[in-house]
Design a protein with these regions (language model features):
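Hydrophobic alpha-helical transmembrane segments of membrane proteins
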Residues: 1-66, 81-209
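Alpha-helix N-cap/start motif
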Residues: 76-77
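Single conserved hydrophobic/aromatic residue that forms the stacking wall/gate
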Residues: 210-216
Length: 216
């Protein structure tokens, strides 16, 4: 809990704070525009809205560029623990808002229930992949981005095909409550995997630096 509170306090000192806040606001605005204009039937609205959580991760992880942080006892927490904890909590809050919106829309436009649950299911899937991507992208950005895009594009195509043939019987039968539980579970699991990957890469970087400082 202390790390979580400290992480949120540190956001105000994040790298390029104004730029990140502007981008976060832009992504949120784009998400709202897509959601409102499509009445929640367009996946892009929820997608942009949920990805604003990545900025919390980015603002903390970039603090490691500071020489002060590199020599601080807080280095590991700022590079591994806090970004994951803070961004995961942000994702949980954003997802709660998104689920509440979908619930309200289902009550207002019950004829679109199928579409709302399809888009929510796909957003959960994409967000899970994005969280894992964050765990490795700051170490292997280009490689992880290429793999992420290929995997997401392939899986999205497969998922779209599956939903097209099965969404009426499978996804609709889940209901908004079960989809919400699935989403929360995916975010928490994504956070755990993200933490483990970040921790593994941190040890790898530390080992590499030690080896380079003691040449044979």
């Amino acid at each position: 809990m202390k790390d979580l509170i400290l992480g949120f306090k540190l956001l105000r000192y994040g790298y390029k704070l104004k730029t990140n806040v502007m981008m976060l606001t832009l992504f949120t605005a784009i998400g709202f525009v897509f959601e409102l204009s499509s009445h929640g039937t367009n996946i892009l609205g929820g997608f942009y809205f949920m990805l604003t959580g990545m900025f919390a991760y980015q603002m903390i992880i970039y603090m490691n560029a500071s020489d002060y942080v590199q020599s601080s006892v807080m280095k590991r927490k700022l590079e591994v623990g806090m970004p994951v904890i803070v961004s995961t909590v942000v994702y949980l809050v954003l997802f709660t808002i998104l689920v509440a919106e979908k619930y309200i829309l289902i009550r207002m436009y019950p004829e679109n229930t199928e579409n709302y649950q399809d888009t929510l299911f796909m957003i959960i899937f994409i967000l899970f992949g994005a969280m894992i991507f964050c765990g490795v992208c700051y170490k292997y950005f280009v490689a992880s981005l290429i793999v992420f895009m290929l995997v997401i594009m392939t899986c999205m195509s497969t998922l779209n095909s599956w939903l097209y043939h099965h969404h009426i019987s499978e996804v609709i039968s889940l209901g908004i409550v079960k989809l919400a539980i699935l989403g929360y579970a995916a975010i928490l699991l994504g956070g755990v995997i993200e933490y483990l990957l970040s921790s593994l890469l941190y040890r790898d970087r530390k080992s590499t630096r030690l080896n380079s400082s003691h040449p044979s």
